[in-house]
């Protein structure tokens, strides 16, 4: 096998697949291996088929691949579940009872070994030991990790897990010595000091770095992980974490928190965001900052609640009745998830507008090793003013951004969902109405001055331009780099609204324009056409609930060249 290995574990929900994933990825990282992992799972607590992909490489990897080099099957039917990804080079490991008929496999008696040690629960540790040996992990690293992880459960549990890992490790060593499996992956000692976090944690850390001190949400996949992350660290960072009774309450709590001087966010998915749109409009009218993480998943309605999609871009763009500014960010990497979330609080506070972070199931559930994230050495910049007796919350100013005060000063901070005058008092004066609409829309000029530019990757004399946004970034980039076209470039948007003015220049310079999106209607393509007047020659779309793989994008990009 090459120096890039794709290991997939497949079984039923509740069987411990995530336990194996957690053990193995952390052991690999601690031993100096670049590691990436993502998962696909059904919407059920028990049964069905769940799988996790662990990619180990000599270089840093961030993208999902279709191929399976080693498949560990923990349930009958697992191979058939993944049959489109299994080919002749796939090595299948498992017990005979768990391998579907017609497939060649190497029998590894995980359960039998675990039972001999004392309990079938140790079968997961046996599997970790086997895979660790195949990949080339130092057993001392594995042993140390198990000692630290199980120390709170007592010496007996620690000893039995080490014994289980050792038995599995010996099997893996035997397979390598017999030449049945060959892996040549180089270690990088610098990886040992890297972070190993998922997208939900990266967004949560970004919120903390951005000064978030209030989160109100109703749990909804795939955004729940952000709520739980901030709740777990609430005391440490002075965060009020509120699990609201519904999404309507959640968004209004957040708006109220901003009014009082906090930095607040809400997390939700498409169905929950549908309930929040009236609150979005309220934020637009009272010019309240607001940060929303919208975790996208296949819709309409409940759709596929545990799968991924980029289907809510236009919904987010046009959310909330009436015309008012908003900002849409779409992280494509864990680093982006951190920095863009941090930036979201800056944008929301400075421009007094809602900022929506468009994540999705693939992004929040994927993780890989990254270098340490840069946390600001100074407190996040805030834009609150001390009010005086003559304070006017909606003072008509040149750039449309009135000084924002909070209760506690000498002035009255009057906000209302009705149209209002400069002091915030309800009015039906039609001239004032026009001035207030124009005031709110003037913010676009200030926002456009700070738009995050798209990232251009490739030759300056490109002929084909591939465009992507959000979580498709890692797969598109790896595909473009390996498609074999020296005249192909990639333009990645991490801010999808407002559109950076350079977008038109990049699109005009290409002879052929291709857009790649995880939706059925090319929503970003529509938006770019609306903003630039330029359409795409080819649209590569996927909407079955799965992310693109590197291989399928290479194949699709080669079509019709």
Per-segment meaning from a language model:
Residues 1-210, 214, 505, 512:
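Active-site cofactor/cluster-binding pocket
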Residues 29-34, 77, 131-140, 144-155, ...:
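Generic secondary-structure signature for well-ordered alpha-helical cores
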Residues 150, 174-192, 207-212, 231-237, ...:
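Gly-rich Lys/Arg/Thr-decorated short loops/hinges at beta-loop-alpha junctions or inter-strand turns
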Residues 14-17, 133-135, 219-224, 248, ...:
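Gly/Ser/Thr-rich loops at beta-strand to alpha-helix junctions
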Residues 2-66, 70-79, 83, 214, ...:
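Thiamine diphosphate
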Residues 196-203, 208, 340, 345-561:
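Flexible, low-complexity linker and terminal segments
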Residues 73, 93-95, 109, 268, ...:
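Short beta-strand segments
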Residues 48-85, 239, 243-252, 261, ...:
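Glycine-rich, anion-gripping cofactor-binding loops and their flanking helix/strand elements
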């Amino acid at each position: 096998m090459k120096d890039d290995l794709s290991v997939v574990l497949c079984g039923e929900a509740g069987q411990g697949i995530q336990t194996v994933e957690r053990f193995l990825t952390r052991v690999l990282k601690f031993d100096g291996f670049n590691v990436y992992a993502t998962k696909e799972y059904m919407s059920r607590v028990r049964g069905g088929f769940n799988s996790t992909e662990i990619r180990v490489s000599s270089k840093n990897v961030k993208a999902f691949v279709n191929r399976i080099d080693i498949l560990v099957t923990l349930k009958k039917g697992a191979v058939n579940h993944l049959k489109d990804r299994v080919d002749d080079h796939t090595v299948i490991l498992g017990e005979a009872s768990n391998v579907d008929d017609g497939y060649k496999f190497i029998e590894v008696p995980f359960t039998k070994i675990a039972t001999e040690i004392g309990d079938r629960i140790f079968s997961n540790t046996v599997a970790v030991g086997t895979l660790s040996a195949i990949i080339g992990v130092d057993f001392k690293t594995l042993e140390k990790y198990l000692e630290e992880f199980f120390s709170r459960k007592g010496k007996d549990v620690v000893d039995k897990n080490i014994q289980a890992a050792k038995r599995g490790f010996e099997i893996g060593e035997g397979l390598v010595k017999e030449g049945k499996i060959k892996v040549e992956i180089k270690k990088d000692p610098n990886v040992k000091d890297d972070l190993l976090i998922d997208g939900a944690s990266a967004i949560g850390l970004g919120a903390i770095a951005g000064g978030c001190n209030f989160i109100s949400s109703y749990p909804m996949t795939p955004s729940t992980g952000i709520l739980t992350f901030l709740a777990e660290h609430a005391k440490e960072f002075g965060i009020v974490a509120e699990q609201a009774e519904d999404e309507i309450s959640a968004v209004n709590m957040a708006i109220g928190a901003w009014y009082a001087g906090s930095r607040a966010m809400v997390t939700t998915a498409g169905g929950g965001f549908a309930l929040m749109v009236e609150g979005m409009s309220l934020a637009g009218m009272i010019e309240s900052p607001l940060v929303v993480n919208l975790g996208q998943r296949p819709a309409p309605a409940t759709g596929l609640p545990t799968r991924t999609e980029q289907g809510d871009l236009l919904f987010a763009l046009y959310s909330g009745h009436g015309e008012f500014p908003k900002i849409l960010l779409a992280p494509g990497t864990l680093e982006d998830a951190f920095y863009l979330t941090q930036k979201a609080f800056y944008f929301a506070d400075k421009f007094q507008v809602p900022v929506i972070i468009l994540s999705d199931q693939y992004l929040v559930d994927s993780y890989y090793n990254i270098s340490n994230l840069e946390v600001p050495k100074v407190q996040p910049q805030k834009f609150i003013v001390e009010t005086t007796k003559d304070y006017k919350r909606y003072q008509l100013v040149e750039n449309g951004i009135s000084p924002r005060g909070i209760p506690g000063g000498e002035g009255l901070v009057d906000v209302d969902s009705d149209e209002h005058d400069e002091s915030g008092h309800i009015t039906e004066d039609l001239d004032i109405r026009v001035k207030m609409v124009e005031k709110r829309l003037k913010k676009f000029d200030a926002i456009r001055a700070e738009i995050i530019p798209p990232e251009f990757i490739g030759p300056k004399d490109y002929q084909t331009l591939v465009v992507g946004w959000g979580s498709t970034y890692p797969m598109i980039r790896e595909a473009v780099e390996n498609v074999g076209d020296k005249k192909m470039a990639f333009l990645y948007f991490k801010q999808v609204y407002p559109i950076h003015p350079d977008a038109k220049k990049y699109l005009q310079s290409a002879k052929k324009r291709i857009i790649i999106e995880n939706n059925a209607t090319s929503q970003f393509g529509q938006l770019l056409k609306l903003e630039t007047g330029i359409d795409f020659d080819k649209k590569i779309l996927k909407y079955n609930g799965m992310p693109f793989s590197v291989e399928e994008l290479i194949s699709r990009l080669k079509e019709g060249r």
